[in-house]
């Protein structure tokens, strides 16, 4: 009888030990499972947060690559599709490095070229507006350099002459930017600021300050800096023709046709020389 009692007690204790062991094993599995799930969630959350943000140095280096690509595309600007790709590259550079002055003023320059060569009215208007915005950004970034002021003023001038959007620019806006360029660098772009000021006087109605004689005066100031500037000679010839100085106009036009063009400005030279020949033929016909 006592043996049966001892046997039952042993069985109970054995059951308790087995139950406890099983319970501990279960707890251990639960803990391991919980830890595994926790690690999985942590890893997933790390992946969802995305890659670490690039450092400012990395952003600047990447923006510099975009600038290099943009310059290469601008060299093919005769193909407006390549020019548009260059504009995209400059926008990317500014997104990566918002304080990049070179990207800002070049974006203004590229948009000006697109606006003055596109046959699509909406694209032209949009490009002038984008050029003005980029020029303003450049001026805000480095007000003491001429590039931003010049291309802002150029886009103001183009918008005033061509754009169907009213209120983008006034004669005073153009004049103020070009006068700022002259204070900072009188010979900038081979006297181009004098040329733009002259065009303001040449093309503006008299009621807002247009005056062909003043146009001649302004453009002549650019001649000491503008010997290789085909467009300066062309527009000065136009001003001479308007005030009846045909011999002086012929002289400027022949300078264009006889000059050796800068390889970096072949598209501009081709345009200027074609217009020069047309004006020369017109003057010769009387």
Please provide the spans of the model-predicted regions:
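Residue-level recognition of tetratricopeptide repeat
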Residues: 100, 145, 188-190, 229
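Bacterial N-terminal signal peptides that target proteins for export
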Residues: 6-35
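C-terminal motif of bacterial Sec signal peptides marking the signal peptidase cleavage site
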Residues: 42-45
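Short solvent-exposed coil/turn linkers within tandem alpha-helical repeat scaffolds
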Residues: 96-97, 186-189, 262-263
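Alpha-solenoid helical repeat architecture
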Residues: 227-233
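Short coil/linker segments at helix-helix boundaries
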Residues: 52, 61, 65-88, 107-144, ...
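Long, ordered, amphipathic alpha-helical scaffolds
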Residues: 236-286
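Bacterial signal peptide processing site
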Residues: 47-49
């Amino acid at each position: 009888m006592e043996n049966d009692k001892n046997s039952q007690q042993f069985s109970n204790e054995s059951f308790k030990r087995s139950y406890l062991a099983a319970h501990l094993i279960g707890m251990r599995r639960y803990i391991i499972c919980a830890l595994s799930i926790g690690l999985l969630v942590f890893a997933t959350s790390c992946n969802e947060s995305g890659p670490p943000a690039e450092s400012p140095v990395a952003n600047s280096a990447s923006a510099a690559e975009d600038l290099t690509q943009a310059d290469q595309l601008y060299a093919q600007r005769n193909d407006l599709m390549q020019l548009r790709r260059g504009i995209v590259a400059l926008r990317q550079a500014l997104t990566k490095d918002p304080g990049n002055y070179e990207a800002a003023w070049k974006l203004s320059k590229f948009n000006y070229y697109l606006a003055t060569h596109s046959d699509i009215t909406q694209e032209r208007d949009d490009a002038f507006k984008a050029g003005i915005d980029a020029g303003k950004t450049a001026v805000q970034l480095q007000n003491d350099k001429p590039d931003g002021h010049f291309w802002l003023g150029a886009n103001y001038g183009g918008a005033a002459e061509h754009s169907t959007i009213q209120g983008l620019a006034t004669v005073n806006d153009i004049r103020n930017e070009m006068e700022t360029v002259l204070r900072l660098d009188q010979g900038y772009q081979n006297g181009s600021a004098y040329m733009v000021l002259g065009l303001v006087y040449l093309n503006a109605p008299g009621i807002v300050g247009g005056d062909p004689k003043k146009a001649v005066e302004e453009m002549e100031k650019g001649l000491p800096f503008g010997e290789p500037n085909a467009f300066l000679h062309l527009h000065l010839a136009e001003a001479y023709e308007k005030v009846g100085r045909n011999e002086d106009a012929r002289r400027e036009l022949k300078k264009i046709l006889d000059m050796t063009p800068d390889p970096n400005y072949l598209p501009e030279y081709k345009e200027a020389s074609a217009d020069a020949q047309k004006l020369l033929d017109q003057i010769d016909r009387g």
